[in-house]
Amino acid sequence: MEKQRVVVAMSGGVDSSVTAALLQEQGYEVVGVTMRLSEEARDADSDGRSCCSLSSVDDARRVADILGIPHYVMDFTEPFQRLVIDYFTQEYARGRTPNPCIACNRHIKFEGLLEKTRALGAQYIATGHYARITRTDDGTYHLRKGIDAAKDQSYVLYHLTQKMMDHVLFPLGDYCKDEIRRMAEDYGLPVAHKAESQEICFVPRDDYKSYLRMHAPQTMQTGAITDRTGHFLGTHDGIAFYTIGQRRGLGIAAEHPLYVIALDASENRVIVGTSDEVFARALTASDLSWTLPRPPHEPRRVRAKIRYGKREANAWMDPQGDGTVAIYFSEPQRAVTPGQSIVFYEGDVVLGGGSIDHVTP
């Protein structure tokens, strides 16, 4: 019987390396692919912790040699620039906080890689994400949280459709991180104790403010800090320097603590308020993607997650007729941030998600 071929996205880290080893052990014909994303991503990190640095490519190639599998470097620089880097700078210019890792997962690591794997004759792609895909008797796929709650990455995968999940494997979803490092040792992989990669691979030293000064100088223009009524309180150094919920570094003398509660890019204004005003009861989200066979049309109770690393909260999801959803939280949520992703769960199953647009106090 002919082996099924799988392309493993190999970053040179321990997770993707063990993914390749596990699938080979399970009988797949494994092909390793490292994605070349940009010159900035390649040069951003000198200690090899960036997923795209030259040393990380070398690590991926070394692991492939040890496993005896072919390894290729594929060029994704054009779509990465257009769909990730440009999006990153444009969102900051709009007074929003982008999530470039989700954009990369969506457009590059899955949509882009799935398209290119056809040229390699592969039936599947696999990554080192800590998540699971299960299939019911009727053929419906469910994207689920990884077993390791501390490492679960289902939040960044809500864009996976039923069609895509038919060709995606997540071998690590049933394991904890410590187990993966032990497996890497058992397989004799040199990356067993390699440090985690940095969050924004194309930003040198993770200094996004310096990066924006160079690539999006319009976000660094000084402007007014006001309260909700428009009363002038001070001057800011550029809206990209501020995040929702921020207290420190405002440079305002006031009788009570003030926090950033909104960013108004149209007027280049940072809006501040009390700690109570940092909380929101509702929001609308757009640019929706659903893991379900069909998008939901009726209101339903969900667990909603408003940022990576934060626990889900009880909420009521009400699909609107214009391709957006309204979300009403059972309890007010702190620092709900436009531009970030909101992901909807039922139990450990991801229903879908979208981008936070408007926030209601």
Cite the ranges covered by each PLM segment.
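ATP-dependent adenylation/nucleotidyltransferase module used to activate substrates
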Residues: 1-158, 169, 178, 185
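AMP-forming adenylation/ATP pyrophosphatase catalytic core
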Residues: 126-133, 137-361
